[in-house]
């Protein structure tokens, strides 16, 4: 039996989760929410995380019914992510590991999403679409690496959606992406937007620039509604994602798709991906917002896999990095 506690705080979510041999014992989380029209700055986000992290830690232990002595390993997000929030979490994780006398493990945030998705859905060897505010990648496992077959060449799809939400002042509570999804359901007019796919790579900066420039003019002249813009943006960027995922599946000979990351809990994206999978005779796997959105349990799960395969992060090496690619990690726990 191996019990791992995971600390996640790479962006505006702070979460601490506990995993015991594939069972989620606890997974509390807090979100730093800013006013409509604003994003979240690293310093202010880190300040929020510092104010709640010890409370979340106590909640995680209480919900799991565990004490420090029961924990076998402390895992934390090493990167990628925003510098100040990552530092906040790493400092607490290092301190806890030393106070409790437990080994420490730095975890790649992207690997955390993948391993949590595999655990929850029981997907065996899927092509992974990883979509969030900071990342957009199409990934498949090969020879001890999660290989990146396609990715954004500029901004992430979640960042595109978030920045559009700021333009038309959509609420950040509970998240801009969720509110765009709800508004898109009421849209009934499709506005043609730039569509940029290059092989298995995508670009979202052009579509964002176009819609940022055109939104107020179109809305002020009654050419469309905010709901129409949300609908059109979603349909366009999700079609791009489905296209590159299908291309990667064909390249890899895969019959499974796993969607992970915060944008992955969007039901319209899952629906569109499901149509493509059905036409190919493939299967789609996805999780709900409990595990798609950044959380501590995903770091604990990746840490559990790493710890059991012999990984440990020594204290002098327990730094953080804002840039940490998925394919940099040797995946020693898979055949």
From Swiss-Prot:
It comes from the Eukaryota. Disruption phenotype: Embryos display primary microcephaly, leading to early lethality. Marked apoptosis is observed in the brain (telencephalon). Fishes do not show a renal phenotype, possibly as a result of early lethality. This is tRNA N6-adenosine threonylcarbamoyltransferase. The gene is osgep. A divalent metal cation binds at residues 109, 113, 130, 294. Keywords: Acyltransferase, Cytoplasm, Metal-binding, Nucleus, Transferase, tRNA processing. Substrate binds at residues 130-134, 162, 177, 181, 266. Component of the EKC/KEOPS complex that is required for the formation of a threonylcarbamoyl group on adenosine at position 37 (t(6)A37) in tRNAs that read codons beginning with adenine. The complex is probably involved in the transfer of the threonylcarbamoyl moiety of threonylcarbamoyl-AMP (TC-AMP) to the N6 group of A37. OSGEP likely plays a direct catalytic role in this reaction, but requires other protein(s) of the complex to fulfill this activity.
